[in-house]
């Protein structure tokens, strides 16, 4: 019943649909985030080899979320997922301070690509529940986004994939900062 009502409202008022590419280093929490958003539960996962695709609906917006494996040997394949991307979610394990430079290099190699220059960028500073986690502002400062992304909308939001903290806020920010026509 509720599903049919949302379909009718979607037809009346229009709904947005967008491709979200979720990337980041291995063990950052991408797959945990995806299934927390989709199922509202923690799904035991192994390192993603390849990709997972799920549709998450939030406030009349369909997010077709592509979670692509982050192991070093898979990163050269990321570019094959760039076409038609509306927003990039880059997930960072904010407690892994020793991997921040590597994460920064990978992020800039992605957003430096022609196909990605007009996408909005959300960085989820994940694992905020851990003691040594960098705060979102620290992550933002380290990544130097304000200095380097003058013409691209971006935001850093603290998240905790296990509790769901920051996840809805991230989807809301993407929805409010993209210009996708309603269907």
From Swiss-Prot:
Principal subcellular localization: Golgi
Taxonomy, superkingdom: Eukaryota
Covalently lipidated residues, kind N-myristoyl glycine: 2
Homology family: Belongs to the small GTPase superfamily. Arf family.
The protein's name in its UniProt record: ADP-ribosylation factor 3
Species name: Saccharomyces cerevisiae (strain ATCC 204508 / S288c) (Baker's yeast)
Binding residue positions for GTP: 24-31, 67-71, 126-129
GO cellular component: cellular bud neck; cellular bud tip; cytoplasm; cytosol; Golgi apparatus; plasma membrane
Compartments where found: Golgi apparatus
Quaternary structure annotation from Swiss-Prot or TrEMBL: Interacts with RUD3.
Molecular functions per Gene Ontology: enzyme activator activity; GTP binding; GTPase activity; mRNA binding
Any further remark recorded for this protein: Present with 1240 molecules/cell in log phase SD medium.
GO biological process, one term: intracellular protein transport
Swiss-Prot/TrEMBL keywords: ER-Golgi transport, Golgi apparatus, GTP-binding, Lipoprotein, Myristate, Nucleotide-binding, Protein transport, Transport
Function: GTP-binding protein involved in protein trafficking; may modulate vesicle budding and uncoating within the Golgi apparatus.
